[in-house]
């Protein structure tokens, strides 16, 4: 996706030619803030999630999944227990490298 440096840098990837700067930069900033907050508040589980391209009013319903499907990773990470991850970036398939 647009938050993954590897995807933006890969000339064979689907987002390599995305012309914008602000959106992918903001996603990278969110990941950095997530890591820094997780270090600053070790007693709290702080993670970022990618719900995927979800059909909403914001995108005119063009997303490839329902809001309920997009919410799955959000709910999962909100329910992470004391031994759960912190400072990471996750989608429904698990940790996402950025």
Label each residue range with its predicted role.
Residues 1-42:
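Catalytic loop of short-chain dehydrogenase/reductase
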Residues 28-32, 39-40, 44, 48-51, ...:
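C-terminal helical subdomain
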């Amino acid at each position: 996706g647009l938050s993954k440096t590897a995807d933006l840098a890969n000339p064979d990837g689907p987002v390599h030619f995305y012309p914008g700067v602000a959106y992918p930069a903001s996603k990278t900033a969110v990941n950095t803030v997530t890591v820094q907050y997780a270090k600053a508040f070790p007693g709290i589980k702080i993670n970022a999630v990618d719900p995927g391209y979800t059909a909403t009013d914001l995108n005119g319903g063009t997303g490839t999944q329902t809001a309920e499907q997009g919410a799955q990773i959000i709910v999962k990470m909100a329910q992470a227990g004391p031994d759960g991850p912190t400072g990471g970036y996750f989608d429904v398939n698990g940790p996402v490298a950025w």
